[in-house]
Amino acid sequence: MDSTDLFDVFEETPVELPTDSNGEKNADTNVGDTPDHTQDKKHGLEEEKEEHEENNSENKKIKSNKSKTEDKNKKVVVPVLADSFEQEASREVDASKGLTNSETLQVEQDGKVRLSHQVRHQVALPPNYDYTPIAEHKRVNEARTYPFTLDPFQDTAISCIDRGESVLVSAHTSAGKTVVAEYAIAQSLKNKQRVIYTSPIKALSNQKYRELLAEFGDVGLMTGDITINPDAGCLVMTTEILRSMLYRGSEVMREVAWVIFDEVHYMRDKERGVVWEETIILLPDKVRYVFLSATIPNAMEFAEWICKIHSQPCHIVYTNFRPTPLQHYLFPAHGDGIYLVVDEKSTFREENFQKAMASISNQIGDDPNSTDSRGKKGQTYKGGSAKGDAKGDIYKIVKMIWKKKYNPVIVFSFSKRDCEELALKMSKLDFNSDDEKEALTKIFNNAIALLPETDRELPQIKHILPLLRRGIGIHHSGLLPILKEVIEILFQEGFLKVLFATETFSIGLNMPAKTVVFTSVRKWDGQQFRWVSGGEYIQMSGRAGRRGLDDRGIVIMMIDEKMEPQVAKGMVKGQADRLDSAFHLGYNMILNLMRVEGISPEFMLEHSFFQFQNVISVPVMEKKLAELKKDFDGIEVEDEENVKEYHEIEQAIKGYREDVRQVVTHPANALSFLQPGRLVEISVNGKDNYGWGAVVDFAKRINKRNPSAVYTDHESYIVNVVVNTMYIDSPVNLLKPFNPTLPEGIRPAEEGEKSICAVIPITLDSIKSIGNLRLYMPKDIRASGQKETVGKSLREVNRRFPDGIPVLDPVKNMKIEDEDFLKLMKKIDVLNTKLSSNPLTNSMRLEELYGKYSRKHDLHEDMKQLKRKISESQAVIQLDDLRRRKRVLRRLGFCTPNDIIELKGRVACEISSGDELLLTELIFNGNFNELKPEQAAALLSCFAFQERCKEAPRLKPELAEPLKAMREIAAKIAKIMKDSKIEVVEKDYVESFRHELMEVVYEWCRGATFTQICKMTDVYEGSLIRMFKRLEELVKELVDVANTIGNSSLKEKMEAVLKLIHRDIVSAGSLYL
């Protein structure tokens, strides 16, 4: 690559080709003969010495890189916030009786309802910027006019673009953000400049391309799968493609005036969010931006970051405007009622909410406060699935919506399988006329005609048409891409009246419905079932209400378990999710940044939003530190030395007593004393003190979800205990037996609150002390009235022992005679003696002086902690991780100790669709040399497939051997990572390259039909196509790699792999193109 292709500060670092024995540079490297750098030859002291030298070298480079950074930004930009204003706008809409056939709001005399919304503006400016308030800006020669009156937020945002200043538009789905993006495109094309429109996913890029092509004509598309008209004035692309263009110094960037980032809140995505951050940092300062986002509460923080790193103004235009107001309803599971809980004015209807909760209470059990009640007929209903009567409830809701003419409806479910099951449940209903069926079938057949004949008979295609003809659709990631697209088109054209969809349908083009239904408001996030967050709920519910068509959008939440009012409010009325950085270092990123002059990995870290968010908190912490110091200086303690000594001894005794408690409650010592009726003092998590309770029973802890789960000794048993002091903030569903985690809303009662008697499950580490008394315990504590009898006994015992219930002596009663334990007890005795000799022990002022000193001591500790936080925030975050990753790259031979990139590093720079380290090692080890193209494709599928599926059958030798060789190299890389102090579990790293589809890919490359390979796996058809598309991307990158290292045989092999993969349904294009 010629350095003249690079823009601004980018200049490629020259890289020496390897020399042969005659000292001549060898351009055609035989990768099979390249020395293996994966063996780390240094051990013990030599390795420590190497690490020490690397750190010294690293520190010098950081200083050097800092000076480069400072040269580029001679003045650190401290953004100035200005031009803050808020506009209140109101409008009148027709009154609506909604689903409950009753007036929901106060109606004006003219029969209208008045609704209001806000538009807020603020701008982050570089210091001394010559700024004119946005309200004073007059658009003279507008790039684009509109046949309708712009909403206030659109008008403000367009004024920002008109005068060439970046803007973040934060607004709800369907609010009209696209109008702002279109103005930026129109202005760029008018000025003969180029504009880039980025989107988070390829499917959305394809849809956006089609939309913008119809609007502007001069539009191109670049997604990795396809390139159309790359010389167009407006280019639509994925963010990954833009990042790749920036790293390669594409000539296109010289002509770009504006970059539009759609769905920029994607930046918080753990996996891909870093791509947005990298791209924004790498873009030249001369470029201006339009950021389109869902509502985010910390938008100004983002604007300040843009202003700081690019030395330009960045406006924030926020609105809570919804073109179609929403009504939010609760539908309790297995019930008949529906309850309006949030009206068009966003008022939470507490009374209706409580009615809905009471309705659930009647379904779950007789006693809403009971922790041991069971569902009727022994059934417990849990959110997140379409089991039990949930399908019947959906049937009921959809029929009601159809009857009241509130269709089309999107039914959101968090499971692909549930979407299909629920849709099949509706298959008896028919929402389409004969004319609609005929038109729909024609559109469907025209789309499917693009596929080869053999693929038109796929089960997924054949089975879905009868549903579609009835006006019922399904949309999830497991569908074939062509089916997803035809369903989107049918939905937009009004042929589908009910669409069952997963969460992914809430991302992308404007495809609203009149009604949105949530089959559950709990979801599995990969680790646990949790309530849907406010941001997730806003994003999905925002699909309700079609602008210009509906007077109201309807949102219905099906709930089958108790929900606290604050949870419901947080979901439907709460703040959207914050935009927090998900920045993390990757090897490809580090190597690409090493490759160009004038920029470095340290530069990326310093300019990341992640770093900015840490540093921005420093002034607040410094203010807090000053307040703490003032409080600290204001406390004077008389006789401070003696008070200090008393405090230190008491804290030491407290620590030793905790050690004693750990020994006493260890299963080996405690279990034999935990007979039914034994009194135990309970403190859950060290803070929730339930006081004294009576043991019911105990059992070994078993995790049915994860049988291999490992617990500490204290966590390995569950003890069921009767307590008198439980308080429930709101009705909570039953506690499962042997579940040590108490649900939200359950806590000890505070003074004045009415507590209840209940059985709670705890672990041994929640036992504060074991009493010397036992109560009578009934055989069946859950029988009617038995808990209350034990509770009464507990109250009586507490009354009889006002000075405290006697506890078991660890030595005399429990016979703990371990030598170390006896020494521990002796230490406590010695300290108690020392404490009694302190001059203040019998002083009347002890309590007062001790309280003052404790407060002063706590302030001192808080100050120390805050100083450490300030220091950590001001330091460059993730710098240690960068050092460790560079060490890995050096030991693998990807770069020199001076950060000069080697040939291996150049290869890794080209790979972003798979693990760059392992793939590079496979290439340089010659692992592909002896493989046939179909074997190579099968091996590469391990990098392209990321989903879970059932275990694949035993692999054929021609596949098992390449897999074994790859895993051996992966294990070596993992060892080098561990030796370089990177947290990695070798087994997890090796097994992250999933082999389950190796045989599927192998047979596909040998000519099997798609129908045949679908029968070989339980993976959804759409997931298979997605894997093949990823595989194609990866193979294309390896073709580029072969060119980079001049390996013609590898290039020919990878080109052959591409031909084998790219056929039939895998090669089918998008309907949007």
Curated annotation (Swiss-Prot):
InterPro entries given in the database record: DEAD/DEAH_box_helicase_dom, Helicase_ATP-bd, Helicase_C-like, MTR4-like_stalk, MTR4_beta-barrel, P-loop_NTPase, Prismane-like_sf, RNA-DNA_Helicase
Motif DEVH box positions after renumbering to this chain: 262-265
GO cellular component: nucleolus; nucleus; TRAMP complex
One term of GO molecular function: ATP binding
Positions where Phosphoserine occurs in the chain: S84, S843
Keywords: ATP-binding, Helicase, Hydrolase, Nucleotide-binding, Nucleus, Phosphoprotein, rRNA processing
Listed name of the protein: ATP-dependent RNA helicase DOB1
Organism: Saccharomyces cerevisiae (strain ATCC 204508 / S288c)
Gene, per the UniProt record: MTR4
